[in-house]
Amino acid sequence: MDIKSEVIEIIDELFMEDVSDMMDEDLFDAGVLDSMGTVELIVEIENRFDIRVPVTEFGRDDWNTANKIIAGIVELQNA
């Protein structure tokens, strides 16, 4: 499974929201993510992709859309 599909699946599993048609929509403004959901999302991303997401790397503006989450994962995998 590619990163995009996996991120969509993670968000759907955690928040019961299909974001495949809203890849650039702000997930906080859309009510998909909140502070607690962000923690759940980070933990799941770390487990599934075997990466560590430093708190300093996870700013709301940097990871607020599905596409930005995907880009962040790719960046951390290549670090």
Curated annotation (Swiss-Prot):
HAMAP family: DltC (MF_00565). GO terms for molecular function: D-alanyl carrier activity. GO terms for cellular component: cytoplasm. SUPFAM superfamilies: ACP-like. The modification O-(pantetheine 4'-phosphoryl)serine is found at S35. Pfam families: PP-binding. InterPro entries: ACP-like_sf, DltC, PP-bd_ACP. Coiled coil: none annotated. Pathway: Cell wall biogenesis; lipoteichoic acid biosynthesis. It is found in: Cytoplasm. Its main location: cytoplasm. The keyword Phosphoprotein applies. GO terms for biological process: cell wall organization; lipoteichoic acid biosynthetic process. Keywords: Cell wall biogenesis/degradation, Cytoplasm, Phosphopantetheine, Phosphoprotein. Carrier protein involved in the D-alanylation of lipoteichoic acid (LTA). The loading of thioester-linked D-alanine onto DltC is catalyzed by D-alanine--D-alanyl carrier protein ligase DltA. The DltC-carried D-alanyl group is further transferred to cell membrane phosphatidylglycerol (PG) by forming an ester bond, probably catalyzed by DltD. D-alanylation of LTA plays an important role in modulating the properties of the cell wall in Gram-positive bacteria, influencing the net charge of the cell wall. Belongs to the DltC family. Residues 1-77 form the Carrier domain. This is D-alanyl carrier protein. It comes from Streptococcus pneumoniae serotype 4 (strain ATCC BAA-334 / TIGR4). 4'-phosphopantetheine is transferred from CoA to a specific serine of apo-DCP.
